Amino acid sequence: MDKIKIALQYIMPKHLLSRLVGKLAAAQMGSVTTAAINWFIKQYKIDMSEAAQSEATAYASFNDFFTRALKPGIRPLCEDNDYIVHPVDGAVSQLGPIKEGRIFQAKGHDYSSLALLGDQADDAKRFEGGDFATIYLAPKDYHRIHMPIKGTLSKMTYVPGELFSVNPLTAENVPGLFARNERVVAIFETEIGPMAMVLVGATIVASIETVWAGTVTPPTGKKVFTWDYPTEGPNALTLEKGAEMGRFKLGSTVVMLFAKDALDKFADGVEPKSVTRMGQAFAKIED
């Protein structure tokens, strides 16, 4: 059955399906939308007591529901300056060192940091010998993405690609998954060096937003787009630790890259398959 599920992903019209679902998710259909949201809450056992708006009727569209805000204070931020924090609610897929420019995906599969970053060689060099962490957001999870550490935006890259599912089954079976799917790469300058936040799209998750650019939707095609941003002066964009930096529609994956000697160790309990909660300690900064 698992092989059939993977095979279907290769032949299904993923981009067309994602566009159709995207239009439905953005539609405001009153009682139909409310009924669908209630079904989704029940199906995925979503704890709406954490949401700023706990009633399904508060959301005009599925997208509003998927990107719902949490109640203030529900995710307390680790204020220890020796630690960076979890950027999202989800589960750790993999983490560890970047070895010879390769990132571990699953047993028998890895991929290059160069490919992940859209073949931006200068960017890839900045993370040689560093560390990575991959976090999967399930459909039930809170879908906003936050800053692990204070950083100033220096570059954004949009990389077109496939829209495979990014669930654990697919990660274990599709080679180079995260370097094949459509993605947005945001690079920040931080006190511990450069940090890349890679927001990976997936089936029916073709819409990725950032707080500075809104929905990132370059023209369709195979061209990589890059934007450079000032890191000093009045137009520089600096986001504080814990601040929102982007959001997904439905679930997806975030891959974080850090420079060599930026991190000392991952926090206790942070390992593959461990549950993450935004704001909790994720890794200790190198002294």
Curated annotation (Swiss-Prot):
Task: Write down the membrane topology.
Answer: Peripheral membrane protein
Q: Which GO terms describe its biological process?
A: phosphatidylethanolamine biosynthetic process
User: Which top EC class applies here?
Assistant: lyase
Q: Which residues form the active site?
A: D89 (charge relay system), H146 (charge relay system), S252 (charge relay system), S252 (schiff-base intermediate with substrate)
- Enumerate the InterPro entries for this protein: PS_Dcarbxylase, PSD-B, PSD_type1_pro
Known catalytic reactions: a 1,2-diacyl-sn-glycero-3-phospho-L-serine + H(+) = a 1,2-diacyl-sn-glycero-3-phosphoethanolamine + CO2
The record's free-text note on cofactor binding: Binds 1 pyruvoyl group covalently per subunit.
Q: Which Pfam families match?
A: PS_Dcarbxylase
Give the UniProt keywords, A-Z: Cell membrane, Decarboxylase, Lipid biosynthesis, Lipid metabolism, Lyase, Membrane, Phospholipid biosynthesis, Phospholipid metabolism, Pyruvate, Zymogen
Q: Name one GO cellular component term.
A: plasma membrane
Job of this protein: Catalyzes the formation of phosphatidylethanolamine (PtdEtn) from phosphatidylserine (PtdSer).
Q: What is this protein called?
A: Phosphatidylserine decarboxylase proenzyme
